[in-house]
Amino acid sequence: SEWLKNTDNQRALPRIQWLVDSLDRLKAYAEIAKNLNKTLRINLELDVGLHRGGFANIHALKEALDLAKQYPLLKISGLMAYEAHVAKMPTLLNMQANAWQTVQQMLYQAKQLFTEMGYKPETLTINSGGSQTYTMHAQQSYANEISIGTAFVQPSDFDLPTLSQHQPASFIA
């Protein structure tokens, strides 16, 4: 919250989306917003199978949206669904395709939930990982923003079939 007390940083607030992965964190951001008397844009993290954090399912996401409505200085700006696990799933027995469909189904359900709760999904950031899966997003995706950066330098752990058209940016001996 020290960073937010700086006047120059406060001017950047309308462009920043704060990633929230739990109800406790949502309450903490509400307290910060209240103390500063500033609106904070909140992007909720949905666990779509990686299990590294975020709201575990659509019901938990609804709980967060219900709670956010109680805080006038919190503005829901979107959703983040990190799906880095998908590209590393084996293709055997359609495991990768099934994981991808689960991600897409959860994104679809989240967009429907946003609509039911009075939000316009087309105005929200619906972000997904993208670095290892952007070619899959090009085929089918409910996300409207993906993060690709690391794919273009092709670190060795990104040597995956979904990125086979890339070559490493450099080799360090």
Predicted feature residues:
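Catalytic beta/alpha-barrel core
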Residues: 1, 14-24
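N-terminal active-site wall of soluble small-molecule enzyme domains
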Residues: 1-10
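Short acidic, glycine/Ser/Thr-rich loop/turn "cap" segments at secondary-structure junctions
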Residues: 9-15, 46-50
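Generic beta-strand structural signal
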Residues: 14-18, 38-42, 124
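Short beta->alpha connector loops
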Residues: 22-26, 131-132
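Active-site-adjacent beta->alpha loops and helix N-cap segments on the catalytic face
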Residues: 25-32, 36-37
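Active-site loop/helix belt of alpha/beta enzymes
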Residues: 41, 47-163
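Short, intrinsically disordered, charge-balanced linker/junction segments flanking boundaries
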Residues: 165-173
